[in-house]
Amino acid sequence: MVGRKLTNNGEFVDYSYENIFNSYVAGSIVKGATISVGYKYDLIPQKKILDGCVKLRTTKDKCSWKSLGYMDAKEALRMSSNYYQYLLAIKLTGKKYTRGMNIGATKEHFEIYRNILKDYGLGTLSGIDLMNEGTGYKGTSITDDQLLNMAIGQYDTYTPISLTSYINTIATSKRNKLSLLNMVLSKDGSVYLKNKNEVLSAAPISEDNLNEIREGFRLVNYSGTGYGYVSNKVKSAGKTGTSESFIDTNNDGIVDLKTVSTTYGTYFPYDNPKISIVIVSPNIKYSNKNSEYKYPINRKVISKVSKEIIEKYL
């Protein structure tokens, strides 16, 4: 568990503890959990749908990051379609999408998402054996727009450690209590205490449905938005995320600058998961800067780290 922060004077300082305390808008990395709402409540379309935009009465057009063509659930994960997730959120309200509509989002619709996300470890404690673990921020505004944002990971915030719980649950079908301690040995080398590896909850959908999400995640790394992140020496699965966020640049209590943050989670080997990695890179692009370039820090870090882990442990 590692964290580094670049200060205003160009120095890196340790930021490791913030992995369990600070929370961030995670973006599309959580779509494996939000699409589970579709599986749980039988909302997944039976045929491929054409990617597009949603326009509600109270919103501007809300679209994917580019036009992604026809897709099923796995393809929607591979290329990180926002539109697919929007339609699931609208169907959850009992409505069929028409341009300019109101969907009548209620607190109950938000709680359906949050309960599913919680079963994956998002928005709740991981149980890690460290003090002052955070659970993130839950938005309080109940609007049609925010329900759609919830569906793509652009509303509530999550800690990096909770994102790790989520990726582990996708990989193994169960959410285990996280721990930095495996065992304690006596002076003679015998095991004095061993971690019990406690299961906190099960994945909230069937194994068949979970396998579809896993295949979508495999496609992310094989030919989708996560292509080139993990060494090709091992079969892997993963999910990228990008989110809009805001910061207070001069500590005056006023959030005054729009930024972009990125996330990525992966596990491998795909067929017998042993390793998972999550990276969160907050505020890597400021919207008021002249350059729109966004440094691919997640891919650079994951590529190097995964290669070293594979060589050492697999």
Regions found by a protein language model. Name each.
Residues M1-G27, A33-S281:
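Beta-lactam-recognizing serine transpeptidase/beta-lactamase-like catalytic domain environment
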Residues R99-G100, S173-K174, K235, T259-V260, ...:
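Short, surface-exposed linear patches
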Residues M1-D14, L117, T249, N288-L314:
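Periplasmic/cell-envelope proteins involved in peptidoglycan metabolism and beta-lactam response
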Residues Q85-L87, Y97, Y286-K294:
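Extracytoplasmic/secreted cell-surface and envelope-processing proteins
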Residues N272, I284-Y286, L314:
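Generic "edge-of-domain/loop-turn" microfeature
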